[in-house]
């Protein structure tokens, strides 16, 4: 190894060591913030807030080291990817530190420690988040892409935990036994823990980019079209989505009171528009195939789908489109024209929706 190569490796090693030190500090701060919240330890809570200032200073030092490394060594390929990832990681760790300071500040505002039901949820969620954060950091420090992929998948599951804990918090609010300020504080705590899980996913993405050059794939959105019968407009919408945006979305349709059969005339119309059909049946909104919380967007035609489900999932967007129900008689002389109007309007609306979700590169 030449003198230049040795100096480059030494500088990289120093950056790696500093990142590991800050990451360890943040992991301990997570434990301290949650413990302070659950026990009412205000001294420990304020130590987390003060500790965040040291984290911010350490992040600025790492930032300076990275820029100096680029200026001195003019890295390329793997070394450049690593420094680029460290700069992103620096932002993610700093944000996590901010979230922990926020949890600590909310802890000292509580009138008393959280009630048992909420306490259990916080403890469980914090444990999940802590493991995900630890594994994400380990994947980065150890250049372990497989651990990064596994951890990403686990992090996605935390969203389901967040929804259940939110429901329990609402139940506590309905009892009226705690001040409204406490409930808002606990809601913020849950939100911050969820955001730490999100940042952990980003750290896993940094690992994959560093080790393999793999970049984050554009998000594929799950869209559900719903009306009463699921025997006309929603079937057309699903077919348009499949054909026009096969790589950007996954599309389904359902009805809250589905028809027994789909008119062959509708199937013929859809096929004449170049949409390949296998087996098309009217699907029930209540079917186990439609887990409402799995969808990013749910679009209802001719009625509000929220009137037909128990609760609106936290992360799902609900839209109402003014789409005609379709001709009463698909064999009538005007049926083709009515279907054509519905089809054209749906093409426009779905295109605008996917453009909003994915931007100009939608496909």
Task: Describe the predicted segments one by one.
Residues 107, 220-363:
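Short polar/charged helix/loop
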Residues 1-225:
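Cytosolic, long alpha-helical scaffolding segments
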